[in-house]
Amino acid sequence: MSSGLSLERACAVALGIVASASLVAAGPCDIYSSGGTPCVAAHSTTRALYSAYTGALYQVKRGSDGSTTDIAPLSAGGVADAATQDSFCANTTCLITIIYDQSGRGNHLTQAPPGGFNGPESNGYDNLASAVGAPVTLNGKKAYGVFMSPGTGYRNNAASGTATGDEAEGMYAVLDGTHYNSACCFDYGNAEVSNTDTGNGHMEAIYYGDNTVWGSGAGSGPWIMADLENGLFSGLSSKNNAGDPSISYRFVTAVVKGEANQWSIRGANAASGSLSTYYSGARPSASGYNPMSKEGAIILGIGGDNSNGAQGTFYEGVMTSGYPSDATENSVQADIVAAKYAIASLTSGPALTVGSSISLQVTTAGYTTRYLAHDGSTVNTQVVSSSSTTALKQQASWTVRTGLANSACFSFESVDTPGSYIRHYNFALLLNANDGTKQFYEDATFCPQAGLNGQGNSIRSWSYPTRYFRHYENVLYVASNGGVQTFDATTSFNDDVSWVVSTGFA
């Protein structure tokens, strides 16, 4: 017993040394290693997760010419070099194509392939995330997270060193606590290698959202739960654990870990405070979860069978070998808090003023007499001038409102149909009455940025940041720069998505 206590004391001292060091002196994976449960996968687009790491964090691909570049930390153990991305992606769009594994095992995450469910891209692949949808700062330095709309997913089916069978593992992720939905399943962690549902207990991943089809926690969600396949679990029961609280933090630390007939859910505000344990105990009482049958693939943003209806934002996360101690995880949480995650501006370009009336002029050559307008519920472009009828002027005028889903962006209310807003539905822009739902708020929230063609603004969907207001055959869509839809055509994209904002006609 005395030797065990000595070992425990030694580990505690080692952890104390690591935790008390500066951000660069000890990253999360240094702390896990000191605790005897090293990272076998370490993913982040915002910072290095090892104090000595200087390699690539992620790769972006730009729409203008299809070229790629890697984004590394500013210094060893530091924050991502967002300026390199901003320069590389200037006047075009960029997607995150690879999230590199910092552990040295090569467990990189790339575009998820089809499985039990197809993704929306060509050949059933999932979408890639926009490189600009989730700007943040860490200790005042700008970085970008991974904003994942429904249909977006990353995967590695040939991971090295991850837990299989009933082997022990831990994992954490830092997420946006305000970006979620009830669809299946916004996950990060261990999944099937086949992209299909191979049975109970074949997954062990962090889930975040307010899905109630399987398990749930206290209140109405969202919750941190574990996706163990054929069930989102909040505790021992396959249904409800009142000890698993609804989350309201902007930045969330989510923790799941599991070993033989033992697992745990923990969580915290990633910007302050310490971890709380929401469940720690035996495996779920339903059949198939003791022992577990983990397969060792890694997923992000999707379910194990490529269920891809969920949404969320990922900043950083790791998977470990072995079952981390609470003390180790507490030190990791302290490091996350020390990183000082904070929100950053979602907009750029000519400023919009809430309460003002605006009109939006097309900048595409040959169409510059046209303005964004509506005809009933259809949003389109029409030729408008000072001599147009009052009715047409009103149809082409929009009141700027604070973003219904995110106050850092904007919503656009019709001048001639008060209470109705521009929203996207199946990627067409429509004018619909505000029904007060979370879905409508998200569909009707847009973030202006400096115009991609150098004129005015390009207006990006908050909920689908790869997509922008675009006129195509005089009808409005939220379009991506290349894609499976006809209105995603790359030809004249930058011009078609750039709009000059003027004082409203009405």
Curated annotation (Swiss-Prot):
Protein's UniProt keywords contain Transport: no
Protein name according to UniProt: Probable alpha-L-arabinofuranosidase B
Catalysed transformations (reactions): Hydrolysis of terminal non-reducing alpha-L-arabinofuranoside residues in alpha-L-arabinosides
Keywords on record: Carbohydrate metabolism, Disulfide bond, Glycoprotein, Glycosidase, Hydrolase, Polysaccharide degradation, Secreted, Signal, Xylan degradation
A Pfam family that the UniProt record links to this protein: AbfB
Signal peptide residue numbers: 1-26
Residues of the active site: 229 (nucleophile), 305 (proton donor)
Binding site for substrate: 227, 230, 304, 424, 426-427, 443, 471, 473, 476, 496
Annotated disulfide bonds: 29-39, 89-94, 184-185, 409-447
Subcellular location: Secreted
Pathway: Glycan metabolism; L-arabinan degradation
Alphabetical list of SUPFAM superfamilies matching this protein: AbfB domain, Concanavalin A-like lectins/glucanases
Region of interest (Catalytic), ranges: 27-343
Domain text: Organized into two domains: an N-terminal catalytic domain and a C-terminal arabinose-binding domain (ABD).
Function: Alpha-L-arabinofuranosidase involved in the degradation of arabinoxylan, a major component of plant hemicellulose. Able to hydrolyze 1,5-, 1,3- and 1,2-alpha-linkages not only in L-arabinofuranosyl oligosaccharides, but also in polysaccharides containing terminal non-reducing L-arabinofuranoses in side chains, like L-arabinan, arabinogalactan and arabinoxylan.
InterPro entries: A-L-arabinofuranosidase_B_cat, ABFB, AbfB_ABD, AbfB_ABD_sf, ConA-like_dom_sf
Glycosylation, residue list: 91
EC number annotated for this UniProt entry: 3.2.1.55
A Gene Ontology biological process term: arabinan catabolic process
